[in-house]
Amino acid sequence: MTIVSGHIGKHPSLTTVQAGSSASVENQMPDPAQFSDGRWKKLPTQLSSITLARFDQNICTNNHGISQRAMCFGLSLSWINMIHAGKDHVTPYASAERMRFLGSFEGVVHARTVHNFYRTEHKFLMEQASANPGVSSGAMAGTESLLQAAELKGLKLQPVLEDKSNSGLPFLIACKQSGRQVSTDEAALSSLCDAIVENKRGVMVIYSQEIAHALGFSVSSDGKRATLFDPNLGEFHTHSKALADTIENISSADGLPLIGVQVFASKIH
């Protein structure tokens, strides 16, 4: 998760990652194939039944004595890079191997480096946009930063969803409000799922209040099955027809209401 407001610049940048002493076993990330380990965040039944492997960006760094810091954009881009490289086998074994690499010291360093580039670019663009502050400026800066960070991985991302409410936001509004009640806009959620299935591979971003959270996605060639990687929870495989429910369950498990969404279609340069 990344803060998309002007406060992002207040986080110090890490240009290098150094290993220190590992945290106690109780605070370390378990093996991604061991679903029953009590250190994992508990999943709702709807997600646990489609889980291929587990992951948690908040504790994987503990295994290497590295300070915790959100790196969902870096992890999602690393995951998509593996998918493009042909490592897209949809089996619990292959999924666990992908998660093990992402959680390894090398995987964390790669993800943190890319995410730090994203964070630094975002800070720079936010400073440029300071003359016109607001959610729109922050979101635009975040979009451009993600596109540039993807270039480091040899990926070309293209945002495909467009908000039609003249809000000026570079994402699709995914909620509707009735009085004090805010609920998911089913039409927007349907557009999100259609974009994922149509574009096959890429990064999905959830915009929730002042937080942006990135997930990777990959869809089978026939469009019938989808794999989602959430850096907070792990890898999930579902029928495309159940994609909307899966995304809602993930956002609920993450505690991130779907305020806005964007799909960044991914291609290799």
UniProtKB/Swiss-Prot annotation:
Class in the EC hierarchy, top level: hydrolase
EC number: 3.4.22.-
Keyword Cell inner membrane annotated: no
Keywords (A to Z) from UniProt: Hydrolase, Protease, Thiol protease, Virulence
GO-annotated molecular function: cysteine-type endopeptidase activity
Active-site residue list: 72, 213, 230
GO biological process, one term: proteolysis
Region (Disordered): 1-39
Pfam families the record matches: Peptidase_C58
Keyword Hydrolase attached: yes
Physiological role: Potential cysteine protease. Avirulence protein, which may be essential during infection of plant cells from Pea and some Arabidopsis thaliana cultivars. May act by affecting the plant defense system. In plants lacking appropriate resistance (R) gene, it probably impairs the plant defense system and leads to the bacteria multiplication. In contrast, in plants containing the appropriate R protein, it is unable to induce disease symptoms, explaining its avirulence name.
Family statement drawn from the similarity comment of this UniProt entry: Belongs to the peptidase C58 family.
Official protein name in the record: Probable cysteine protease avirulence protein AvrPpiC2
Protein encoded by which gene: avrPpiC2
